[in-house]
Amino acid sequence: MDDLNKYLINKGKKAKEASRFLSSVDSNFKNKALHKMGEDLKANMNKIIAANKIDMEKGKEKGLSKSLLDRLLIDEKRVNDMVNGLIEVAELPDPIGEVLNMWKRPNGINIGVKRVPLGVIGIIYEARPNVTVDATALCLKSGNAVILRGGSEAINTNKAIGKILENSAIESGLPEGTIQLIETTDREIVNKMLKLNEYIDVLIPRGGRGLIDNVVKNSTVPVIQTGVGLCHVYVDGSANLKMAQDIIVNAKTQRPGVCNALETLLVHKDVANSFLPEIVSEISKYGVESKLCEKSFEVVKGSIKDAKVLSLISEATEEDWDTEYLDLILSIKIVNSLDEALNHIYDHGTKHSEAIITENYTNSQRFLNEVDAAAVYVNASTRFTDGSQFGFGAEIGISTQKLHARGPMGLTQLTTTKYIIYGNGQIR
């Protein structure tokens, strides 16, 4: 057995042992541990930020994009956000032990359905150190042990945060294997995690298409897929165009490097001539590059004279309709009808978050009913697809699959059920 196997199996054994304890631990016990983690993160803020500076400097040397560097960055505000996230999760109702239903059979047996933890959860993620804290909080509160494998870009930050969380858990009386961070950046460790069925009950990948596809295709451990977010906004012919502009600017520019950001804008032909020059000019103020279909390129180029705006437009390629930019780039297409918009989303969407801007009730209902996505919006930004925005506290990811969980995954999505049966001597 090689060293990586030994290293990983050791962590798997500890996690499995810890999960047995966590499955029945008192809710107050877990909440106290979460509060202590928050206190310890705050007390060690300078250490975390110092470790992050090393990762940021290395990231800049490697030429990471601005959006990736933004995801990697940890400052005082983001540490405080992590602390607040831990406290929020501590204050959420504990789902474990909840009896969902109970019924009595004619033979006198009482049967119930009870919520229980999944067991050991493996999280594989990229350059977002806050995931280390969010995943830990949700896994602990839902009674699961967690094995964390972050991206190499954030290794120093994750080590600093992981050590604090692991020590806090142990000092709170939790087993050693409750929270474990994989500290090696060797990519082979990921491939070995995908086969660790004996110890890991479910894997959750968070990252780009390459990471997610690798996990889904090669894992023998069950996977909850957090998919790529190629999100669309469709501006209907009846749309309030001021509302549409506000939503598009927010969805594209507030934080372009996240999975619920807007990537493709579809505009009905009836409003294209008036709306497209305005929206392209507006988003150019934020440095957004617009990749336009042939018709929209003609409309914009014929209406705009500002050299700066014109420098940020180009004609879209077929590849652009399938690209999650995670950057200040937006694909734009004119469509002839709602049907064409629905077909485009069907062909190119990733089942994450889709929005329609419309004042037409019938069109809004068709969009809600016919779009196959985890979150479908009428007259609101796709940026709301988020655990905290949905009232779940932190989230472990946004699932784009249909089995077990779909959409933002909070505490209840990290549980399963078992049947509990009470009898008084019945035999079959």
Swiss-Prot record:
InterPro entries: Ald_DH/histidinol_DH, Ald_DH_C, Ald_DH_N, Aldehyde_DH_dom, G-glutamylP_reductase_CS, Glu-5-SA_DH, GPR_dom. GO terms for cellular component: cytoplasm. Its EC number is 1.2.1.41. Catalyzes the NADPH-dependent reduction of L-glutamate 5-phosphate into L-glutamate 5-semialdehyde and phosphate. The product spontaneously undergoes cyclization to form 1-pyrroline-5-carboxylate. The keyword NADP applies. One of its GO terms (molecular function) is glutamate-5-semialdehyde dehydrogenase activity. It catalyses: L-glutamate 5-semialdehyde + phosphate + NADP(+) = L-glutamyl 5-phosphate + NADPH + H(+). This is Gamma-glutamyl phosphate reductase. GO terms for biological process: L-proline biosynthetic process. Its main location: cytoplasm. Pathway: Amino-acid biosynthesis; L-proline biosynthesis; L-glutamate 5-semialdehyde from L-glutamate: step 2/2. PROSITE patterns: PROA. It is found in: Cytoplasm. Belongs to the gamma-glutamyl phosphate reductase family. Keywords: Amino-acid biosynthesis, Cytoplasm, NADP, Oxidoreductase, Proline biosynthesis.
